[in-house]
């Protein structure tokens, strides 16, 4: 599965468009991460617990997007993006979205 942020893929032509696909995950923060974030906001520095939460959430959302695209018969996703939303300082939603397409190498 090729997943790109651009609207085309060099060396390939888009032979079929299967439509918008997305992968979504909503995760709650660990209370320890919330406490650490409170202290770090005063002292400064990376919020490692939140960084890990976002990293894992993006990977899960991307995997779900790829699975949906594959289920529709696509072998690529173009115009790929992430969108992140925080919920009441207790959790985070990560949505990966793009357009599922069928591509063929240009001869």
Curated annotation (Swiss-Prot):
HAMAP family reported in the protein's UniProt record: UPF0145 (MF_00338)
Pfam families xrefs: YbjQ_1 (PF01906)
Family to which this protein belongs: Belongs to the UPF0145 family.
Organism: Mycobacteroides abscessus (strain ATCC 19977 / DSM 44196 / CCUG 20993 / CIP 104536 / JCM 13569 / NCTC 13031 / TMC 1543 / L948)
InterPro entries: UPF0145_dom_sf, UPF0145_YbjQ-like
Name the UniProt record assigns to this protein: UPF0145 protein MAB_3451c
Source superkingdom: Bacteria
